[in-house]
Amino acid sequence: KLVWRTEESYFFRWSKYADRLSKWIEEHPEFIAPAFRANEMVNSFLKNGLQDISISRSAIDWGIPVPDDPKHVIYVWFDALINYITGIGYGTNDELFSKWWPCNLHIVGKDILKFHTLLWPAMLMAAGLEPPKRVFGHGWVLLKSSQSDDSGEKMSKSKGNVVKPRELLTVFNGNPDPIRYFLMREMDFGQDGLYSEEALLTRYNSDLVNGIGNLSARSLSMVEKYRQGV
């Protein structure tokens, strides 16, 4: 049953920074990458208007106490994003902070790009700080259910369809290089990529064993035979 509740909360005036965010993105085309992600952020969120966002709770007692108002605690995205700067000395070590901020690059998942390219820069602007120079939103590694599956499915702990890297390493006797090769070969950074163990083994055998492996073996054999190994 749906129960409506009312709760006192502090809000961050996100809407106040919509124009500044639009100008920043326009003047810094490298800020959001890949470029099509920038279009998503602008067209799906900025153009529709930003709503002020709740940043505190008063009905729970876990979280970071709000300064001067201990009845409220800060939670979720607002405090999580601040970790980027408090972890490098903001407010406690100016020399350390100036060494590392503004940062060159955030790499985040596409599902949290909105918070890192619209909310986080607005928070920094409110604090008089410069946003990161670039935020790159990478895609997901989707699990193929079969060889004919061209769309894949997002991995989920609740569904139990996750790939466990340590177990996968045992397939190659602990060597991660075949897995790295597959990911670099098959997946376009920034886009979603499809994974299956069958596809991994097929690529391993066709490229690394039959292709590069055979070429290396033949080349080394000829060097040894005709050039005395030099």
Describe each PLM feature range:
Residues L2-Q228:
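Structured secondary-structure scaffolds
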